[in-house]
Every structure is written in structure tokens, then in C-alpha cells.
Amino acid sequence: MYAHLAQMLNLLVTPSSGPATVFTDGPIPDNDAMKEALGKVDALKFNVETGKVIRLVPAVAPDIGVTVVVEGGKEYKLGYLGHKPYTVVAGKAMITRLGAEIEENPVMGEHVKTVDPLGSTNVKGVFVAGDAATPMKAVANAIGTGERYCRSWDRAAVDNGGHGEDLSLEEVHINTRPSSTATEFDKTHHIIEKMYPLESVRHLVVEQSQLCYILFGAVLAYAGWRWVLRLDILNEAITDLMSNLLNYYLTRRYPIHHSETGQQIPGRSYRWPNGQGDQGKFLDGIENRAQWAKEHGRIYRIWAGTTPEVVLQTPEHIKLVFRDSDRHSKAVNNDSGYLMGQVLGQCLGLISGGDWRRVREVCEAAFTHSKAINYLDLIHSRVGDYLQKCTALQRGTLNPADDFKFLPFLVVGDILYGHMTQEMEDELRQMAPLRERLFQFVIRGGLARYTWSQYLPTEANHALREFRSRWVAFNQAAYCRARERGATATPVYQLFTAVSDGMITAANAYQTLDEMLFANLDVTLGGLSWNPVFLAANPAVQEELYENITAAQEAEGPAMPMYLQDSSTYLAACILESSRLKPLAAFSVPQAAPTARVLDGYVIAGGTNYIVDAYALNVEHEFWGPDRHEYRPGRFLGVKGADLRYHMWRFGFGPRQCLGKYVADLILRVFLVHLVRNWRLGFEDGQIADSREWKRDLDAWITHPTIELTCTPRGARA
């Protein structure tokens, strides 16, 4: 508990304040739990004082703070002092008579045991709410920490003539020995009243009462809405009414007019509560984009929640918008609302300006073009081991998205944390389904878009709390491991060192690691899983690639470092062609230009978010010729990267391209080399050859195939 409190206090540490100090009030017990807690404290670079605390001396007005005096006369002058006291349940006798069960924790204190999020107890009809129902007491923590705590000491000194009377440790109940009698509890309560005047306490009670009414009203509204949703006719009528009213308001709140005709930009009407995002953009985006383009032309507007997004489909428009992409800002929370903000809102890919530059400065060294090749042996080892153990390859039938799901996951994990232990791999595999379920709530939108939804007992909030708790614990342990091993080049070490130095926030670190591992699991898997499908559907291309790989292997050996770094090879062309025909998603993530743009006569204000229709650009545009729908990797041979600029969306445009693009390409190339030189891929009988008709996972926000392939060993493995 105290280690957790120390982590919270770490957010207040600044370069001028110096490291925080943890007072143990005596010798530290020698047990595993305490060793783990000290490991966390040590990782934060905190000082630890093991001397017995003798007294606390409050500052004299107008100064604030408190001086902690320990055995031997050593003094610590602090501006902020926090403590979590042992607490007992007030009205315990009444609760016991009711038969409600009271739990006791040797550190946290007592609380009434609840059996569900609604506060039910073991006694039917008896409910409990507030601090009585949780080990983590909000009021006790508020009293025990913060600026008001220090000011209250000053107030106590003034009440005693301004002499700064010393208050002993026993008087303020700051030690960890439990209060076992009512007399001791009353004594502590008396001291608290001394520290907080009655007006402050009354104000606190009023604020709590108001909050309770707000929460109660929110729960009632939520319950009422859930009931309304069961009545389909009424639900549809309410949705239509809300949609029409909000569409009328939003189109006037965010006008986009033609400079000559004055007409509004064409586009979709707002549909409550999500508009057209995220489900409309991602889950159903492939079907929707064709219909929307047909109805509205080559430039139009959609709504992500209540935020407008302008859809770009042509290289000319993209060039006009992205000419100053270094000054663009990403949409707040990706235009996906509150829950997205809690999961990835502070990650590298979704922040802008100075925050983005600081986080990128910490991360980029591990993902540069020159650094990526250093991971070649690691990637070869992971890929070879994974494919050798893949039961799908052994049985002769393969579903690429399912059977190769964790391959890029494990490679990236080794890069982020250093070579992972089996325990680390197991924990990440166990967290992956929870993270996937959490992101499904993000994509579905609805209540999860709104900040007030955090107060509701929803499954999304439960999943968020569970994932966040496990993710923080995993990364804290991984950081300690990296520090102990001297793995200072790993991103986990660099990120949390930057947090300690005050360069970035803890949220930046946790969410950027999440983005690199879990968010990019879907992204990398999307690119990795479509390549085998295209090769299986095109045997001639597959055989040409096999011959190309064999020749490179004979020239360089099995590792083929030069071949794998070369972006002009047939292997690289196959990957590009697959990415062209099957973009990761129908639309790019939203970002805004800093100044106004005029597109086809429509004046679009600075700060308006744009998204790119990837299929319109990658597949439908005439740049790709009459065979634009066919898989022909040769179209990329001899073509320079500059010639493709603004004609193909893959890693983005300009300085804000995907940080991990070099590592991602290397993973894809090594994977295809191992796969093609050892197995021959094919389609099952009756499988459709036209890629436009191939089935995909309709529940995945990134395009993943749901296609069974046949795989036959080519002979002795290389």
C-alpha cells in the first residue's frame, strides 16, 4: 500500500524538489511483500529513512509545510507529507447487528465487504456505499495528503499562539500500528477535528452529498436508458429525434461553405451517438467508403462523435493538406471519445506539439533505420522458432490471422523489454484478450465516448480498471528488470527514466508501450496475414519469390542481411502490393492542418480534422493503371519512393509517419523469407481468387483475413 502511495507522490516530484523520502518509522520487516515494495520505491529513486519518527513540527505562518524529526535529531523539512492511516469502520456495532460482513486488512484497515459493483452485502437488502465499502478510503487519503494537510498543521500552530507546538506521532495516528479500541479512534478523530475547522468539514460533507446526488442521478439515467433500448420502436424514434436536432446544430457550429456558391460541403448527416465513427469508419469502413464516395463525390464530411472529419480521396487534395504535415496535430483521443483517451490518449501516436517531440525524442533511437538491422538476429530467431512450433503448418491447413497472431507480438516485446522470460510472455498472452475486449468497447462508442460514463458500473469500465492494473504492474516489474540487467537501451528503461527525470508523464510511458505492443499487434498482424493469402492465390508470384529468396540465400547465407534491408527487391515489392490492395484500415487516423485549406472551392478552417480514404488512394485511383485491382508486385520494381508519395497510404505522410515502420518491414520480410523458402502455400478448392471477395474479420478494426490456406513443406528446411 505504501509503495503504491509512493508511486502516486512521484507525480509531484520536480527537478527543484529533489527525490521524495519514504519514512518507515523503524526497521523494515524482512519479507517478500516488503522487498517487492522496496523494489518499487528504489525504482523511483526515492530516499528511504528507517529511523523512528519522534515528532512532526509544523511550519509557522506564512510558511507552510512540516519538519519530520527522527531518532538522533535528524530533520527533514517537507512541503508535502502523505500517510495512509489504519482505519476502522464507524458504526461497527450497528453493522455487526445487521449481520453484514466486515473485512480487515492489516495495513488498510476495515471495510464492509461488498459482492458486486452496486454495493450489495452478504445480507439481502443491505447495501453499502462510499468509504465504508472500500479499503482505499478517499476521505482518509484526502486528510492524510495534500497541500491542505500542510496548511492544517500551520492552522493548528496558529491556534496555539503561533508557537508551532510539536504534535507527537501518537497524536496524529500516523504510525502503522492499528487502532484497536474506540478510545484510540476517538483520540485520532479529535486530532482530525483540531486540524480541520468545522466549516471545512461541513464544506466537505456538502461536496460529498452533491457528488452522491450526481452519481445517483447518473445511475438512474443509465438504468432508464438501458430500459428504453429494449423498446426498439421507442429507441428508434428517440435516436432519430436526437440525430436531427444535433445535426441541425453541428452543421451550423462547424460550417464548411463553397467560396463561390455558398453551399455546404456534402457529407453524411450526424447519427446519434457515434456519428459515423468508429464503427462506421473502421469495422464497416470498406463497405461504407464506397457508398459514401458514390453519394457525395471526391470530398465530403463525416462525423466522429460530434467532431467533423473531412475525407480526402485524391493525391491532389492530400498534397494540399499535408504540405506542412510537420505542423499538423492529431485529433484529441483520435476523435473516439473518453475511453480511447484512457487507453491511448497520451501515447506517442495521438499527442501533438511539444509533448509529441519530447516522447519521440525518448523513443526514436530504438527504431531508426540504422538500429532496426541490429534486431535481425532476434527476429530470425523468433520467427524460426515460432514457425517450427506452429501446429497449423504441421497439419497442413493455415489461418494466417489466427495462427501467426502472436509472432509480431513476441518480436516487438523482445525489442521493448529485452529478451523476455517465459513468465513475461505468458503474462502478455493472458492480457491480450482483455486488451482486445477493452478496445472493442472503444470502437463501439456509445456511452464510452462520454466522460461521465466513468461513473457507471459498465463492463467497459471494469475491463479498463483490470487491464490498467495489470499493465502498470507488468511494466513496473519490466523496468526494474531492465535496470538490474543494465539494459539501458531498451524503450521500457528509457521511457521510465524520462518519467523520473520529468521529461514525460507516466501516462505517456504506459500508453506508448501499449501502442507499440497491443495497438500495433493488430496493425502488424494485418500486414503479415494478408501476404500469405496473396501468395497462395498467385502461385506464379510465389514461385518467383521463392527463386528470388533462394538466390539471395546462396549469395549471402541464411541471414541475408543485405537482401532484407533492400527496398528494391521482389520481396519488398510483394509486401508493398499486398499493403496497397489491403490497407490496414479503410480510413487513416484523423489529424488537423494548422491553417485553412481550399479544396474544390470549399473553405475548410484550420484545426479541422482530415482522414484519408485508403482504398480510394491505394486501389481506385487511375495512377495504378487498368489492372489496379490485380495483384502484380512487379509494378513496384524500379519505382522510387518519391514517385509514390501522396499516391499510397501506408505509414502516413511526412515527419509523423509510423515510428516503427523500419522494424515492421523487417519483421514482414524475415517472416516471408522463412515461410516461402520452407512451405508452398495454396488455396483450398472452391476458394474465390478475386481479392475483393475475400472474407475478413468483421469484429477487427484492422483488416484481417478469415481464409484457410493449404501449406506443404518444400522439403528439408533451410
From Swiss-Prot:
Residues 216-718 are annotated as: Cytochrome P450 monooxygenase ataC. FAD binds at residues 72-90, 109-114, 515-516. Bimodular acetylaranotin synthesis protein; part of the gene cluster that mediates the biosynthesis of acetylaranotin, a member of the epipolythiodioxopiperazine (ETP) class of toxins characterized by a disulfide-bridged cyclic dipeptide. The first step of acetylaranotin biosynthesis is performed by the NRPS ataP which produces diketopiperazine cyclo-L-Phe-L-Phe via the condensation of 2 phenylalanines (L-Phe). The ataC domain of ataTC then catalyzes the formation of bishydroxylation of cyclo-L-Phe-L-Phe. Keywords: FAD, Flavoprotein, Glycoprotein, Iron, Metal-binding, Monooxygenase, Multifunctional enzyme, NADP, Oxidoreductase, Signal. This is Bimodular acetylaranotin synthesis protein ataTC. PROSITE patterns: CYTOCHROME_P450. Disruption phenotype: Impairs the production of acetylaranotin and accumulates the intermediate cyclo-L-Phe-L-Phe. Glycans are attached at residues 334, 548. Its EC number is 1.8.1.-, 1.-.-.-. Its cofactor is FAD; heme. Heme binds at residue 658. Residues 1-20 form the signal peptide. Pathway: Mycotoxin biosynthesis. The lineage of its organism: Eukaryota, Fungi, Dikarya, Ascomycota, Pezizomycotina. InterPro entries: Cyt_P450, Cyt_P450_CS, Cyt_P450_E_grp-I, Cyt_P450_sf, FAD/NAD-bd_sf. Residues 1-215 are annotated as: Thioredoxin reductase ataT. It holds the Pfam family p450. GO terms for molecular function: heme binding; iron ion binding; monooxygenase activity; oxidoreductase activity, acting on paired donors, with incorporation or reduction of molecular oxygen. Binds 1 FAD per subunit. Coiled coil: none annotated. In the N-terminal section; belongs to the class-II pyridine nucleotide-disulfide oxidoreductase family. In the C-terminal section; belongs to the cytochrome P450 family.
